[in-house]
Amino acid sequence: MLKEFREQRINEIKQISAKGVNPYPYKFEKTHSSQDIKAQFENLNPGEVKEDASVSTAGRIMSLRHHGKSAFFHIKDFFGRIQAYIRQDIVGKDVYEFFKEHIAIGDIVGVKGSVFKSKTGEVTILVKEIELLNKPLRPMPEKWHGIKDKEVLYRQRYVDMIANDETLNRFRIRFEIIKLIREFLNSKGFIEVETPILEYVTGGASARPFITHLNVFDIDMYMRIATELYLKRFIVGGFEKVYELGKNFRNEGLSYKHHPEFTSIEIYQAYADYEDMMNLTEELFVFIVEKLFGTTKVKYQDIEIDFSRPWRRVKMRDFIKEHLGVDILEDTEEKMLEVLKQHDVEVEIKDKGHLIEKLWDLVEDKVVQPTFLLEHPVEISPLAKKHREDPRVTERFELIIYGREMANAFSELNDPVDQYERFLRQAKLREAGDEEAQMMDKDFVRALEYGMPPTGGLGIGIDRLVMLLTNSPTIRDVIAFPLVRPISFEEEEMNLEGGSQE
């Protein structure tokens, strides 16, 4: 069926060309978006025509209803949909006959005309000129919204965006969030910088890296798992407020909140500590939410998330003790293992840091409203400064919302001797088989030896933030072109032919 449709369309395009019409023109002068037109003419009365108005817009035809020598159709552009009305007595017989014979749902067209409000109160373009801008070779997926196999949507996100306004809007919001983050930080005097994606030594997080090969030097390199260590080199060099927003790569599994290629932002401020980063985090999130929604309250999965300041603060030690009855600072590793066993948690690496992280995993989903989780033990915070009052823990926080880590921040460790010793401990974990332990980065230690001022650092997961603010249940819904298990193009085509859109 798809093959026959394509052949029919190819023949139709030849017919259109034979009539002297270019089915793929080079340009169209679009002066108004659908949103512009509706906003400008919303105050018209039903039935009122604004003859002296002149608009020019373009988009994809999403619906089409013929009525003899006239037709109504809806055009969809990036900002929404708008109705258009075409009549033979206005555009002329030849133009209307061409429209009737060759223009169909899915075609991209440009229209020019005046504006009126229909009797039902819908702002409508009265078409005076129309131009075919593209005739697709594939049919529009009328039942695309009913697909049960979401991997089809992920593989062909472009069609998902065409068919589902909510998908297009979700990504519009995503990039609006990114724009707002930059606007906020730039207004605070932060400078956006760039750091390497290919690294000789990777670090800044506990994760398994991707390995690639650089032919010119004939060496293996790593794709970055975080931007932290190079951003702190900027601070050493004399920058005082920096950030980088970009992709990181971790060779790990897929889940509703994990994706091997993901977007994050890291922010560093000299002469600041983690208290300053908490204030900055609250201020940034409230700025974004209020700009997007005009309120500090957001609905996520039927739960109202309230971003009103100040946010709750709780120590990791206290929270785990409250819910599991184990003290991560005082109790033995045997006691921690016993508690984990009671909850059917298998532990491959019995290092104390891993045990603490496994314990936290058991209780993380109990945090719903924005909460700063404070004072992580030194064992799981190799880049954070020891707490000024209790050296067993660090000046670190994670922002937890709806049971998910949204941000991670420290008073940054700037003692090169302490940093070297912590890298040594991480190196021993790697030797013991922990592929996520951090690598020894001697150049970073050397940078610290030149002196880094007291610094506060903050990292925010952009994808999880977008999930929260678009009410999306899984991370792949907010990544435009996420990873899916590869199948052949032919198999994909067979799936479409077989009615996977039903």
Curated annotation (Swiss-Prot):
The keyword Cell membrane does not apply. One of its GO terms (biological process) is lysyl-tRNA aminoacylation. Its EC number is 6.1.1.6. Mg(2+) 1 binds at residues 398, 405. The keyword Ribonucleoprotein does not apply. PROSITE patterns: AA_TRNA_LIGASE_II. Coiled coil: none annotated. It is found in: Cytoplasm. Its cofactor is Mg(2+). It catalyses: tRNA(Lys) + L-lysine + ATP = L-lysyl-tRNA(Lys) + AMP + diphosphate. It holds the Pfam family tRNA_anti-codon. One of its GO terms (cellular component) is cytosol. GO terms for molecular function: ATP binding; lysine-tRNA ligase activity; magnesium ion binding; tRNA binding. Keywords: Aminoacyl-tRNA synthetase, ATP-binding, Cytoplasm, Ligase, Magnesium, Metal-binding, Nucleotide-binding, Protein biosynthesis. Mg(2+) 2 binds at residue 405. Its main location: cytoplasm. It is an enzyme of class 6 (ligase). SUPFAM superfamilies: Class II aaRS and biotin synthetases (SSF55681), Nucleic acid-binding proteins (SSF50249). InterPro entries: Aa-tRNA-synt_II (IPR004364), aa-tRNA-synth_II (IPR006195), aa-tRNA-synth_II/BPL/LPL (IPR045864), Lys-tRNA-ligase_II (IPR002313), Lys-tRNA-ligase_II_bac/euk (IPR034762), Lys-tRNA-ligase_II_N (IPR044136), Lys-tRNA-synth_II_C (IPR018149), NA-bd_OB-fold (IPR012340). Belongs to the class-II aminoacyl-tRNA synthetase family. Homodimer. This is Lysine--tRNA ligase. It comes from Thermosipho africanus (strain TCF52B).
